């Protein structure tokens, strides 16, 4: 009898301990999810982030839901984030190397592959800006437009174009999707791999003409080419540079500094966001904090389905597939999204993932 009573006592105590420990963990995670500690540093629950694959798969999950109605800018937090990022990088300076940084014939090491080197060609040097393309520039509102299929049928085109400065990623097509993505492009990125994927590697005159036409639509916009990241895209960069010079295109070319990507990663790691390599979208948001008073994000949705279970394309303009939760991916997009969602809820930025209000 005494043995049975002892077992019951141990069992009861164990259950109580489990119950209180679970409540303590839940409170801690809830606190960490939205906590800004110290002088504005973002802190996220690692356990919540690491289980994001399971979370997003739950039907009707509310983890990533947020409201755009009633959203208000938190100007003091915006200034705090800008100040903190400036401790790691100055986007005005690091957005591009300038002519005085190199001379033709200089040899540099690739940012993500220090064993490999690149020679600074005459064409590349001639296209380097004299001064930073973002020098002394400041905007009231900016749009950073990602390429997720969540934009399709959003009707966000007019809203995106209404911003003072629009940043786009990877030379994404806009004209045929204007109702959803707009057409205004003030700053647009272009990974060298785009040449092969979207323009056939310039194999024929038709491919080259298509590319030239796309760039001609940019006028005086900044074309941001990460030419120094890894070996393999150098010939594409040279082809692009040659076409710009040959056709006297008016785009303003920019090539990010050799320290930029490590500085951006350092900022987020210090703020307890364990990214691998920042995605283009996160990179652009980080840069935009330097010259934008209010940042609006569109086309950010790193999941194969929306919250209603409807399939969402990786890119709104093609059928490319992407494994968001693969450990082989160089990015941690779901983690990045969760971070941006926290910032949205605190008024540091506005994240739009649904339909836009008619203007």
Curated annotation (Swiss-Prot):
Predominantly, its location class is Golgi
Residues assigned to the Lumenal compartment are: 21-359
Q: Which reaction does it catalyse?
A: [N-acetyl-alpha-D-neuraminosyl-(2->8)](n) + CMP-N-acetyl-beta-neuraminate = [N-acetyl-alpha-D-neuraminosyl-(2->8)](n+1) + CMP + H(+)
Show the Gene3D superfamilies listed in the entry: Glycosyl transferase family 29
> Which EC class is the enzyme in?
transferase
Q: Where in the cell is it found?
A: Golgi apparatus membrane; Secreted
Q: Which GO terms describe its biological process?
A: N-glycan processing; oligosaccharide metabolic process; protein glycosylation; sialylation
Kindly identify the residues recorded as the active site.
Answer: 331
Q: Which family does it belong to?
A: Belongs to the glycosyltransferase 29 family.
- Locate the coiled-coil region(s) and give their ranges: none
- Keyword Glycoprotein: yes or no? yes
Report the source organism: Cricetulus griseus (Chinese hamster)
Q: In the record, what terms sit under GO molecular function?
A: alpha-N-acetylneuraminate alpha-2,8-sialyltransferase activity; sialyltransferase activity
- Per UniProt, CMP-N-acetyl-beta-neuraminate binds at 147, 170, 279-281, 301
Membrane topology (UniProt): Single-pass type II membrane protein
Q: Which gene encodes it?
A: ST8SIA4
Q: What is this protein called?
A: CMP-N-acetylneuraminate-poly-alpha-2,8-sialyltransferase
Q: Which keywords does UniProt give here?
A: Disulfide bond, Glycoprotein, Glycosyltransferase, Golgi apparatus, Membrane, Secreted, Signal-anchor, Transferase, Transmembrane, Transmembrane helix
Question: Any ranges marked Cytoplasmic in the topology annotation, and which?
Answer: 1-7
Could you state what the record's PTM comment says about this protein? Answer: Autopolysialylated.
**Any idea of its EC number?**
2.4.3.-
According to its UniProt entry, the function of this protein is described as:
Catalyzes the transfer of a sialic acid from a CMP-linked sialic acid donor onto a terminal alpha-2,3-, alpha-2,6-, or alpha-2,8-linked sialic acid of an N-linked glycan protein acceptor through alpha-2,8-linkages. Therefore, participates in polysialic acid synthesis on various sialylated N-acetyllactosaminyl oligosaccharides, including NCAM1 N-glycans, FETUB N-glycans and AHSG. It is noteworthy that alpha-2,3-linked sialic acid is apparently a better acceptor than alpha-2,6-linked sialic acid.
